[in-house]
Amino acid sequence: MYDAIEHGWYSYLNGHTLFFIPNNLDQDFQHLADTLDAFVITGGDDIALRRTVETKLASAMMQRNKPVVGICHGAFLLTDLLGGTIVDVDLHMEQLHPVMYFGEVKIVNSFHNIGIDKLHSTGTVLCTDELGHIESWIDGTLAGVVWHPERMDQPWLPDEIETLLFKENK
């Protein structure tokens, strides 16, 4: 396992100021949450220290009602923290597959072997895969996306999450 940011995020978030949070417990998460407009929990390995840092900052952001968007690993982390259910999924490792977004078929990528089976009680499902697993969800200022938009030739996120993540003048 390694700890690094996917290079696709640089181009995907072009024009936005990026601040990378080190996996260090000796930092002021409350101050970080005060200074950040949003927190994106990117994909990657589920390393204990990383998970602890992300959980502390996500909690501080939630206290301030600021956007927290989880991508892949981040979506699973938020789902778990909020009481959703994660299950093993076959046939999703390193391939494209369809998701349903309010009756519209979208093609997304997949790099995992787990999925979201049930969402916490206040979340709204935005996209599901062909087996009914939840691929994206939103709950106020919190959102999860199982695929990697930063690894797509034409990145796509549901409109609700695009608005949450990229809205101006927060």
Residue locations for each model-derived region?
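Active-site-proximal beta-strand elements of phosphoester/diester hydrolases
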Residues: 107-108, 143-148
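An acidic, glycine-rich "communication" segment
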Residues: 88-110
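Substrate-binding strand-loop-helix patch
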Residues: 109, 115-118
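Conserved hydrophobic/aromatic beta-strand scaffold that supports enzyme active sites
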Residues: 98, 134-136, 144
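N-terminal beta1-alpha1 cap of cysteine-dependent amidohydrolase-like domains
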Residues: 1-73, 81, 87, 92-94, ...
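A generic "binding-loop/recognition-motif" signal
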Residues: 74, 112
